[in-house]
């Protein structure tokens, strides 16, 4: 008794735990194992009392998911539970009405209408089973039961109406569920969507059964009742047919139902009940769970596969590309193979678990039969022993009768023993099968673990391939961008030249055409035609003058950047000689010499840019004079090629030639590389290094003075920005001074190690090229320091641009980098002075970055302060400001693209000229 009470307690506790775990607030489908435990419990208990007792303690109105899972679980119990479940559920039918009314107007996350429909469905379903107790919960009726129902015409007529109502309730439920899925944009691969869709699996099974019975019963009614009396049946059935067909088609497209339930296909047209021949061609729609294998499978494990998680079954989609990458195709194939293997393993495990549970149930049943047989055998033994004792006490006269009774008892005992042995053999057989099934399950789990590991390895391989693909795409993008930039710059220059040539040719053709077409009329009206041609030529000359002026404006911009590139002086001298020869042509004095004017203007703008760059390359001291003269020549050229001045064309061209002769003289006087005296280069280096030190000290002092003036003239955010920028500039100059000191110490060490008993002057003379490199670097540092101070002063006073200061800081960092590289060339790699110089160079780079960051932050702060306060604007004014801001943004983007193209062209020209110089020096060295 104690053992039975303990087993009973364990059973009840398991039922309570299963109900509590099945009905939870988590938006995931109902767990099959918990539902299966409850269903098996109803069969073992032959009642659903424990379930309803447990559910009565749960406050289903607390959360919509609780009510939804409760309805799903009740639906499962009605189908797969004990045959008494529908009868017992009818006692709680009012509970469904209460829940339906409660959730009717509470559209919580979309569950409200769905729960209302589900509760109404269960209410009608329980009432249906109570009205027709012959119909089981799973709706499986054999032919004899169906014929019994069809025997009573009135009952069959009313039953078809009730079945139509059941179909309506099921279809209303699926409509509500799909409407909620569409409104929330859920799909069948997420847990929330699966939670909503899981009850529709039972709806598919129920609708297929009701549909089959309706077709057969309505055909039977038409054979016994006039068709006019069944018009309502036919009308309702046609509507239900269309809705059911749509339901099956939509459900078959969902990935969630694909591996769980077999969805039947209905014909294109509803059966014609007025023709009994359609009944012969009618085919019963079979809907069954895949875990059952057919519609006649065991009900206890009918929903094992219902929670198959397909959330990860969606294959990874590679980003669309016009040309598919083989590696991406390999990734997709590997992903699909992994998912297929995983699905096969999971399905195999589900089937194994289902069979194990069948074996366990059968084992429990056999155990009960075995215990019953054992008790009968014990009772038979006791009866035999009792009879033997009675036979010993009876009279001898009844010996034969007693012997017969003893033999009969012995035969019964022997039969009981044989039956017991058979039951024991069957029990051992099922036990061995159970052990074998457990062994197979363990092997399957090991295979699953191996497949999971293989999937993980393949995922890592896929990730690596993705990274390689992305890196290759980035490399291709960078290469394409670079190629497009270079090609764009070249194409733009070529396009401009071609456009200019085309315009000149078109203008020439226009002039020639005018001359030819009016040649015959020239005799009659020569004065008039001459004036027209003169006006046309003047217009052409005016247009060409505008083009030349634009080239001069471009040249003026190029003069501002003359210090950013290097240019060989001898090439500039050659271009200057060509320009002098061309401007000596007296045809330029004529206003209508359009072709010569255009060519001369183009050559003049190019030569002026080259002259300024060559002067900076040859000698920084000579740069100022040459640059000023270039600007003077440019101004004279603008006057000479325009019609605004009162002077004649010949006088303006004469003044231009004089300015160009002056510039040519300055270019001739530029020092060449061969003019540097190797004997005095050492002294020049020392002097330049001292001048560089003085320039840096003066720059530091001027920055301090600028800082003092800024404190006096500004306040607030402007003062904070100026303080930050000037402090970083001062720190930059300090580390540059340290780098210069380290460079001089390293140079002293190099000279001491390499003079070999000679004087430093002799060392500088022997290594004059290295000395010249140091000299050039020192000059660049001095000039860059002065430019930095001027840019900082302009930023503080508001007269300059923040970008100028950024460029100046980067320029001085580049100059110090040149000094660092020049000093490092002949240094010993193990020298401590070289290490100190490297540390100083890194400090310069860091402080340069800090200056750039401070300038950008200050610019952002000031822009935010000045431009982001729009509280004073009206609606119309704000819209106008918005449009103007967009226009300005587009203009700036266009200007940025043009400057990038210009920079690319300048760099290309610079590299080309540098290559020419290198080739010429190589030829001279060979000679």
From Swiss-Prot:
GO terms for cellular component: clathrin-coated vesicle; cortical actin cytoskeleton; presynapse. The gene is hipr-1. It comes from the Eukaryota. SMART domains: ENTH, ILWEQ. One of its GO terms (molecular function) is actin filament binding. Its main location: cytoplasm. This is Huntington interacting protein related 1. It comes from Caenorhabditis elegans. Disulfide bonds: none annotated. Residues 7-136 form the ENTH domain. Residues 336-524 form a coiled coil. It holds the Pfam family ANTH. GO terms for biological process: actin filament organization; clathrin coat assembly; defecation; developmental process; endocytosis; neurotransmitter secretion; protein localization; ultradian rhythm. Disruption phenotype: RNAi-mediated knockdown causes a reduction in progeny numbers and a lengthening of the defecation cycle. Touch responses are normal. Expression of poly-Q 128Q (128Q consists of the first 57 amino acids of human HTT with a 28 Gln residue expansion) in RNAi-mediated knockdown animals causes a more severe reduction in touch response compared to wild type expressing 128Q. Residues 673-914 form the I/LWEQ domain. Regulates pre-synaptic vesicle recycling at neuromuscular junctions of mechanosensory neurons. Plays a role in maintaining a normal defecation cycle.
């Amino acid at each position: 008794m104690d053992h039975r009470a303990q087993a009973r307690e364990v059973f009840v506790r398991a039922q309570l735990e299963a109900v509590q775990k099945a009905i939870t607030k988590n938006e995931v489908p109902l767990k099959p194992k918990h539902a299966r435990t409850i269903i098996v419990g109803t069969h073992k208990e032959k009642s659903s009392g424990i379930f309803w007792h447990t559910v009565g303690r749960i406050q289903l109105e607390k959360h919509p998911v609780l009510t939804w899972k409760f309805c799903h679980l009740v639906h499962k119990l009605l189908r797969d539970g004990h045959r008494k479940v529908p009868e017992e559920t009818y006692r709680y039918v009012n509970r469904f009405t209460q829940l339906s009314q409660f959730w009717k107007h509470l559209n919580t996350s979309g569950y409200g209408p769905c729960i209302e429909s589900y509760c109404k469905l269960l209410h009608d379903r329980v009432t249906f089973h109570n009205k027709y107790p012959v119909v089981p919960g799973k709706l499986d009726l054999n032919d004899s039961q169906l014929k019994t129902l069809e025997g009573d015409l009135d009952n069959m007529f009313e039953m078809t109406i009730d079945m139509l109502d059941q179909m309506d309730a099921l279809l209303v439920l699926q409509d509500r569920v799909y409407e909620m899925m569409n409104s929330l944009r859920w799909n069948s691969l997420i847990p929330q969507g699966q939670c909503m869709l899981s009850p529709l699996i039972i709806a598919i099974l129920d609708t297929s059964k009701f549909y089959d019975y309706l077709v057969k019963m309505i055909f039977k009614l038409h054979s016994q009742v006039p068709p006019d009396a069944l018009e309502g049946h036919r009308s309702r059935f046609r509507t239900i047919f269309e809705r059911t067909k749509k339901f099956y088609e939509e459900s078959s497209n969902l990935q969630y139902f694909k591996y769980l339930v077999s969805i039947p296909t209905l014909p294109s047209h509803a059966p014609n009940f007025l023709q009994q021949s359609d009944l012969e061609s009618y085919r019963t729609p079979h809907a069954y769970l895949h875990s059952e294998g057919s519609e006649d499978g065991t009900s206890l494990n009918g929903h094992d596969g219902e929670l198959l998680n397909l959330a990860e079954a969606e294959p990874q989609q590679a980003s669309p590309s016009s040309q598919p990458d083989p590696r991406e195709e390999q990734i997709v194939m590997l992903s699909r193979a992994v998912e297929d293997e995983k699905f096969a393993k999971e399905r195999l495990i589900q089937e194994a678990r289902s069979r194990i549970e069948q074996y366990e149930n059968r084992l429990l049943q056999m155990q009960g039969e075995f215990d019953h047989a054992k008790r009968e055998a014990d009772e038979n033994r006791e009866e035999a022993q009792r009879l033997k004792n009675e036979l010993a006490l009876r009279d001898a006269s009844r010996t034969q009768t007693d012997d017969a009774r003893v033999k009969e008892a012995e035969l019964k005992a022997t039969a009981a023993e044989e039956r017991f042995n058979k039951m024991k053999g069957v029990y051992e057989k099922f036990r061995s099968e159970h052990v074998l099934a457990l062994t197979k399950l363990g092997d399957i789990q090991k295979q699953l673990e191996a497949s999971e590991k293989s999937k993980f390895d393949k995922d890592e391989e896929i990730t690596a391939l993705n990274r390689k693909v992305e890196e290759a795409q980035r490399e291709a993008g960078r290469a394409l961008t670079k190629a497009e930039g270079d090609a764009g710059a070249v194409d733009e220059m070529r396009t401009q030249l071609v456009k200019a040539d085309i315009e000149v040719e078109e203008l020439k053709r226009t002039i020639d055409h005018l001359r030819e077409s009016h040649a015959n009329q020239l005799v009659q009206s020569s004065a008039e035609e001459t004036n027209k041609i003169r006006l046309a030529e003047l217009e052409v000359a005016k247009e060409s003058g505008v083009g030349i002026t634009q080239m001069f404006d471009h040249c003026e911009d190029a003069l501002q950047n003359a210090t950013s590139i290097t240019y060989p002086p001898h090439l500039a001298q050659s271009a200057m000689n060509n320009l002098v020869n061309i401007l000596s042509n007296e045809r330029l004095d004529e206003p209508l010499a359009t072709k010569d004017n255009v060519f001369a203007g183009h050559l003049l703008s190019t030569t002026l840019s080259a002259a300024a760059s060559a002067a900076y390359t040859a000698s920084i001291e000579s740069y100022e004079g040459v640059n000023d003269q270039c600007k003077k020549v440019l101004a004279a050229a603008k006057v000479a090629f325009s019609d605004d001045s009162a002077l004649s064309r010949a006088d303006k061209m004469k003044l231009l030639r004089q300015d160009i002769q002056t510039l040519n003289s300055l270019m001739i006087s530029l020092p060449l590389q061969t003019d540097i005296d190797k004997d005095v280069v050492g002294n020049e280096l020392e002097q330049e290094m001292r001048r560089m030190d003085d320039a840096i000290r003066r720059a530091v002092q001027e920055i301090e003075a600028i800082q003092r003036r800024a404190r006096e003239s500004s306040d607030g955010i402007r003062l904070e920005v100026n303080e930050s920028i000037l402090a970083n500039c001062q720190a930059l100059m300090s580390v540059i001074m340290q780098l210069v000191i380290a460079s001089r110490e390293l140079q002293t060490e190099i000279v001491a190690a390499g003079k070999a008993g000679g004087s430093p002057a002799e060392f500088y003379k022997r290594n004059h090229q290295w000395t010249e490199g140091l000299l050039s670097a020192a000059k660049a540092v001095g000039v860059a320091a002065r430019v930095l101070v001027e840019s900082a002063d302009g930023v503080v006073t508001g007269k300059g641009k923040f970008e100028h200061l950024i460029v100046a800081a980067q320029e001085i960092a580049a100059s110090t980098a040149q000094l660092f590289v020049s000093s490092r060339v002949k240094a010993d790699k193990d020298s401590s002075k070289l290490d100190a110089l490297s540390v100083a160079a890194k400090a310069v780079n860091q402080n340069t970055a800090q200056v750039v960051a401070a300038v950008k932050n200050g610019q952002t702060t000031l822009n935010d302060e000045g431009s982001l306060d729009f509280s004073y604007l009206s609606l119309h004014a704000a819209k106008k400001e918005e449009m103007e801001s967009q226009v300005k943004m587009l203009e700036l983007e266009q200007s940025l693209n043009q400057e990038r193209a210009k920079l690319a062209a300048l760099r290309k020209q610079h590299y080309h000229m540098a290559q020419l110089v290198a080739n010429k020096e190589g030829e001279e060295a060979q000679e």
